[in-house]
UniProtKB/Swiss-Prot annotation:
Any one GO CC term of the record: cytosol
Pathway, per record: Carbohydrate metabolism; D-ribose degradation; D-ribose 5-phosphate from beta-D-ribopyranose: step 1/2
Gene that specifies this protein: rbsD
Database matches in Pfam families: RbsD_FucU
Protein name stated in the entry: D-ribose pyranase
Stored HAMAP family: D_rib_pyranase (MF_01661)
Length: 139
């Protein structure tokens, strides 16, 4: 059995096989997931697992160099945005790099998800709690 926090085999495999600049999306329960993209559905019930819990576990396994967030989160969900940016700052410190943070319209964000290797659906039920993580290299 694995020693690290991430126990979900499908998600662990996805992260392990990410190449440089490939992306993984973590989303709330409502984001539309294109049929052409692998769905890793972790949602059990409203709020379980949360967006932030899932982000924390994923970023313990994944080296991140860039993220994309929907612009609308600034107005519609500032609490999650603040917590997300705090987690990214902590990740920068842990990884020893600067993570590029980009904001795009929600419509553009959804188009970007088409290029994700997978989309991880959480039980989060708050608006615009979504992020696209782009893989970096730790060297």
């Amino acid at each position: 059995m694995k020693k690290t926090a991430l126990l979900n085999a499908q998600l662990s495999h996805c992260i392990a096989t990410l190449g440089h600049t490939e992306s993984l999306t973590i989303c709330d329960a409502g984001l539309p997931i294109p049929l052409s993209v692998e769905r890793i559905d972790l949602a059990l019930t409203a709020g379980v697992p949360s967006f932030l819990q899932t982000l924390n576990v994923v970023t313990n396994e994944m080296y991140v160099e860039r993220v994309v967030i929907a612009e609308e989160i600034k107005e519609k969900n500032p609490e999650i945005l603040t917590a997300l940016l705090t987690q990214l700052q902590q990740l920068e410190s842990h990884q020893g790099n600067q993570i590029q943070v980009e904001f795009e319209s929600h419509e553009t964000f959804k188009k970007f998800t088409l290029e994700s290797k997978a989309i991880v659906r959480t039980g989060e039920c708050s608006p615009y709690a979504n992020v696209i993580l782009y893989s970096g290299v730790p060297f």
